[in-house]
C-alpha cells in the first residue's frame, strides 16, 4: 500500500512540517546549537542524536518510552548510509547527482522514496513505519547541513 506525504519548510528554518492530504501529520525540528533533532509523525515521536566529529553516528531513540531503537552509520563520502533498526539493516542513498531524490531499501527493494524541490517535497512510502520514514528524512537533512558547513569553510 502506498502512502504519500508532502513536506515543506521555510528559508533558514530548522523545522520541516509533514502533511498528508493538507493535514499536518508531523514535523522534524532541529534544536539550535545542538546535535539533537526531534521528529514526529502520526503521534510517533523520536529523537535523533548525532555523535562524532569526522566519523558520525546517529542514535535513534523513541521519545514515548525513552528507548533506544537503532542507529545510523554514514559512509565516508556521505552519499549512502546504513540504518540499523529493529534488528534489521536498511540502506539509505541518494538516487541522483543533484541529491534531490533519495530512498530507503531493504533486501526486498525500495521501501520509501523522497523527492525535494527547493523548500518542499514528497515522501512516497510502501511501509507504515513512521520511525523509518522520519529517519530517511532526517539523514538527508543532516547530510545537507554537513555539506553546507564544508562549503562555508572552503
Residue ranges: model-predicted function:
Residues 36-65:
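Short, well-structured hydrophobic secondary-structure segments
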Residues 1-35, 41-43, 67-69, 74-154:
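Low-complexity or membrane-interfacial segments used for flexible interactions
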Amino acid at each position: 500500500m502506498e502512502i504519500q506525504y508532502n513536506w515543506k519548510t521555510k528559508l533558514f528554518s530548522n523545522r520541516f512540517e509533514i502533511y498528508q492530504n493538507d493535514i499536518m501529520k508531523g514535523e522534524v525540528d532541529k534544536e539550535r546549537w545542538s546535535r539533537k533533532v526531534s521528529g514526529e509523525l502520526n503521534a510517533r515521536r523520536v529523537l535523533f542524536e548525532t555523535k562524532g566529529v569526522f566519523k558520525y553516528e546517529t542514535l535513534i531513540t523513541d521519545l514515548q518510552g525513552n528507548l533506544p531503537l537503532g542507529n545510523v552509520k554514514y559512509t565516508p563520502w556521505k552519499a549512502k548510509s546504513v540504518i540499523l533498526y529493529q534488528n534489521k539493516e536498511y540502506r539509505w542513498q541518494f538516487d541522483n547527482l543533484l541529491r534531490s531524490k533519495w530512498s530507503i531499501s531493504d533486501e526486498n527493494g525500495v521501501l520509501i522514496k523522497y523527492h525535494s524541490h527547493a523548500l518542499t517535497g514528497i515522501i512516497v512510502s510502501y511501509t507504515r513505519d513512521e520511525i523509518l520514514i522520519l529517519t530517511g528524512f532526517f539523514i538527508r537533512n543532516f547530510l545537507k547541513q554537513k555539506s553546507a558547513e564544508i562549503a562555508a569553510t572552503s
